Regions:
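Thiol-based oxidoreductase modules, predominantly thioredoxin-like and allied folds used
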Residues: 74-91, 107-118
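Short, internal strand/loop/helix patches
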Residues: 22, 94-143
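Sec-dependent N-terminal signal peptides
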Residues: 3-13
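Amphipathic alpha-helical repeat scaffolds
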Residues: 29, 49-53
């Protein structure tokens, strides 16, 4: 019996993640509430690793504009703070929340700080990187404000470079709404 259980466990570990859906992944919002991405089922998602002290930080404005314009039509903009790039997100969740709210009027959903690369990379970012490779087929996130567009069925449609302005993604979003 233990042998059969061992084989079952091995097969589950070996092949389990291949069948994983984005909706199975747990996330923690900036206030510490844990839930699965199933919350966003049947919504288009724009998932972005963000930072408060980056040359691209002003993209918060464009992300918020997309949120305000398309939330009611089915878009969820999701911001995941990350401190892996030159420590450009050093604050606590409370610091980040306050900065985003006061400086950019951010109302789109923000999450707890995560790693996007390395062995401690969040499961969501492992999934995103495997689903949509970067330049030359690499998986590594190169910088803050890398963006992933996900359709209503949970399929990663496209990955955008940090330099891509949120307004430049608008047409792709409209095609999915």
């Amino acid at each position: 019996m233990r042998f059969i259980f061992g084989i079952f466990l091995f097969i589950t570990i070996l092949f389990g993640e291949e069948n994983m859906s984005i909706y199975d992944i747990e996330v923690k919002d900036i206030d510490g509430k844990v839930f699965t991405m199933k919350k966003y089922e049947n919504r288009v998602m724009l998932i972005v690793n963000v930072a408060s002290k980056c040359g691209f930080t002003n993209q918060y404005e464009g992300l918020e504009e997309l949120h305000k314009k398309y939330f009611d039509k089915g878009l969820s903009v999701l911001g995941f703070p990350c401190n892996q790039f030159l420590s450009q997100e050093p604050g606590t969740e409370e610091d980040i929340k306050e900065f985003c709210s006061l400086t950019y009027g951010v109302e789109f959903e923000m999450f707890s700080k995560i790693d996007v690369n390395g062995e401690n990379a969040h499961t969501l970012y492992k999934f995103l990187k495997e689903s949509s490779k970067g330049v030359l087929g690499t998986e590594t996130i190169k910088w803050n404000f890398t963006k992933f567009l996900v359709d209503k069925n949970g399929k990663v449609v496209k990955r955008y470079a940090p330099s891509t302005k949120p307004s430049d993604i608008e047409k792709d979003i409209l095609d999915l709404l």
